[in-house]
Amino acid sequence: MNGKTAECENYSDWKDFCKYTAMQNAWSFAHFALEKSSAPEEVKNLLEQRFASVVGQQVRQEFFQGAIFDKLDENKIEYLPIKGSTLRALYPHPEMRVSCDVDFLVRQEDMPAVREALKSCGLEQDTSCVGADHDVWHAEGGVTIEPHKSLMSLTDFAGYFTDFWQKTFPVGDGSSRMRLKTEDEYIFLIAHAYKHFIHGGCGVKTLCDVWLFRKKHTDMDEEYVYTELEKIGAAKFDKKIVALADCWLGDAEMDEESEILTDFLFDGGVYGTDKSSALMGTDAESVQKTKRKYLLKRLFPPLKSLKLRYPVLNKCPFLLPVMWIVRIFDAIFTRRGTIKRNLKDCGSMNEQDVEKAKKIKEIIS
């Protein structure tokens, strides 16, 4: 990514390396970093196999993405590609940047027509994931497509993105594809990362996205970016993430804060863990209060969270207590593994975890 081959002559814990690579879904990164290194051949062979698998998945995604966007163009439906599909071009090799799904934004009033377009492309809607802000559709080969009606949800700053359509403009090639100016694209990148970070973690891909974005767009209006990020409380987070990215991929030296953030990002996987989400999501001063708040939040989630799982709450919010009971019984009969995992996470929390979470929040807030 930065043109360097990893130095690993004195490294020996390859089992741990592969574990963290899997947690971060970073097989492509690892493959390119180690293919010409002195890493053991069995490790490089494993990375090559995993790399071939994720590239195959990416090819399938791009096929369906192209078909869907062509159909939207044909029907004059404006759309804004977001997340991985817009960031891939920043990488030295596009196949380095893999995505779990294909995301794009459409206007809420266009969603019925978008659904018809997806059906005509051979996709099937996942009716168990009907949410307030996006649909989930599946295609053969394990491809997932997510058309969004809003850029952000379930955050205190979601309102900032309500009218983001006003900041879009046509790409100018005669299609219905829209784009954002560079600064607004970066603001969404940071806001999306910040949302995941404060809910448990955002993974190493985010650091790479930020570093490469800034490396390509050196002429951004930094005053505008800072002012807008201040509005959503993410300006300091941006500063710390940029500094950390420069430690990882540039020439900056790691300090104590960088080490703390690095450990948090690596341990959290792509989107963080339930445990880290619980620790980051409470302001409790003790481990017992943190555990209590965590269990209460798991048993009785707020209205905005359950709207995604139970769309009836959008029109009838007074049914929230009923949906709490429905959700509990649903978990008992269909998601016992989740219950066991949540109880295990709660039981493993200690004072050190609480102090670490407090330190991380101090660094970015």
Where do the model's predicted regions map?
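Conserved NTP-donor binding/palm subdomain of two-metal-ion nucleotidyltransferases/polymerases, i.e.
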Residues: M1-C100, V106-S365
